[in-house]
Design a protein with these regions (language model features):
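N-terminal amphipathic/basic-hydrophobic helices that include classical n-h-c signal peptides
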Residues: 1-37
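Surface-exposed peri-terminal alpha-helical interaction modules
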Residues: 23-340
Length: 340
């Protein structure tokens, strides 16, 4: 039976030094680590993978909660307070992760702009100004200062580091389960017209799926493993996500922004086609096409973010949402480049 790709795999430069792989047999296939036999991640891989995943997804989660907090109507005081508390919880976790990640993550991850972009701080400042919501921008400033290592000396990672990161993963998972429950509650209330929230139900469902994806990763890491997904399962998740982003952008742009809306709809059609066309026999072609289309939507999102920040685009897209979806495209691009 063919080996299944371990989803998200290794989003950093591979280290094939046998010193770091005492319990696993790996081989490299198109720059992926494919698991041939069961076993545990090495200490180094567990720590670095955990930190990179948390740096990306903890920020994504806290921003989801910010979007919810600022999209509820003022009468929903309890729900607004719950969103704010959960957001602050992920801010605290992210601050810890940033502290431990310095010199412990890959340079390629830092340079990908998936953790922060050149626009993140300004987007946070404007979003806080426009909404009155609290955003801890000191975390972002610290992330701009992160440095990575291309190689690690023997003994760099100790058992204490593994315990610290394992505890961070567990606390992230505990909070994430509460966030998923909260999002599902909001979706049910909105679907039953018991609340009014300035977020499409499809957006709430979208951010719930992303949280469940993150939870799947953390559950696997608890066993020092990675979730097993086929290539098409991984591609379909992210291509569906990119199509969703294009759909939301189209819906939030002012009707007068006809060119931008038309471009967004082109991306919807393109990513939908990739999702429908991915099979075992077509996966290599879909990987290449996904890379090409994701580079284009990344450029589109980057231009849109710049336009929104300088007040050059008419929309109801909050600045941090523009930067948020740009980072997700950057994350997917790094994965695709490794696959291709």
């Amino acid at each position: 039976m063919a080996a299944r790709f371990k989803a998200m795999l290794y989003l950093h430069e591979p280290n094939t030094d046998k010193h770091f792989l005492p319990n696993l047999k790996y081989y490299i296939n198109v720059h992926f680590f494919v698991k041939e036999s069961t076993g545990l991640l090495s200490n180094q891989d567990f720590i670095r993978f955990s930190l990179e995943i948390n740096l990306f997804f903890q920020r994504i989660m806290k921003e989801h909660l910010l979007f919810i907090e600022t999209s509820l109507t003022p009468v929903e005081t309890a729900l607004i307070a719950e969103a704010a508390i959960l957001k602050e919880g992920f801010e605290q976790l992210l601050a810890e992760t940033v502290h431990y990640a310095d010199r412990a993550i890959s340079i390629s991850a830092i340079n990908s702009n998936e953790f922060v972009t050149p626009y993140t701080l300004k987007a946070e400042e404007l979003t806080s100004k426009f909404t009155g919501a609290s955003i801890n921008t000191e975390i972002t400033k610290a992330e701009y200062e992160l440095t990575g290592l291309q190689s690690f000396p023997d003994g760099y990672f100790r058992e204490s580091s593994e315990r610290i990161v394992g505890d961070l993963n567990q606390r992230s998972m505990n909070l994430l389960e509460k966030v998923i429950s909260f999002k599902k509650k909001l979706l049910a209330l909105s679907a039953e017209c018991k609340i009014f929230i300035v977020l499409y139900d499809e957006i709430i469902d979208h951010i719930t799926q992303e949280a469940e994806y993150y939870l799947e990763l953390l559950k696997a890491l608890r066993n020092k493993d990675l979730p097993g997904r086929t290539v098409c399962e991984e591609l379909n998740f992210w291509n569906y996500t990119m199509a969703g982003h294009a759909s939301f952008i189209d819906g939030l742009l002012d009707p007068t922004e006809t060119n931008l809306k038309e471009t967004a709809r082109t991306f919807i059609d393109g990513f939908d086609r990739l999702v429908k066309g991915c099979t075992r026999s077509t996966e290599n072609q879909i990987k290449r096409e996904s890379l090409q289309l994701t580079e284009k939507i990344r450029n589109f999102k980057r231009s849109a973010t710049e336009g929104i920040l300088r007040c050059g685009i008419k929309s109801i897209i909050i600045p941090l949402l523009a930067d948020h979806v740009l980072r997700e495209a950057n994350y997917y691009l790094r994965l695709l480049r490794m696959m291709n």
